[in-house]
């Protein structure tokens, strides 16, 4: 998974940093995590196939990265810190 090239909209990157405190630059590093897990997201794949990646970033944060692929490039759609809630 580490040979994927990424492209993103800078406005969306700023919005994601404001909303989730995660930049797409950091989110991209999750794809270098050999233990990352990728899931197909059928609930959000009406117009294009979308995926959810769970992995560790270079800052050692566990991130959830929602993304798709267009013209053989990855496009992050949203990224945030994974939060486990204890009951």
Where are these regions (language model features)?
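Ribonuclease/tRNase effector modules and their secretory precursors
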Residues: 1-87
């Amino acid at each position: 998974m580490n040979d994927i090239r990424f492209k993103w909209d800078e406005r969306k990157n700023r919005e994601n940093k404001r909303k989730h405190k995660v930049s797409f630059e950091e989110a991209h590093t999750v794809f270098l995590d050999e233990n990352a897990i990728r899931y197909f997201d059928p609930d959000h794949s009406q117009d294009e196939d979308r995926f959810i990646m769970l992995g560790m970033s270079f800052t050692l944060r566990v991130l959830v990265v929602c993304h798709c692929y267009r013209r053989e490039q990855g496009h992050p759609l949203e990224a945030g810190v994974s939060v486990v809630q204890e009951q």
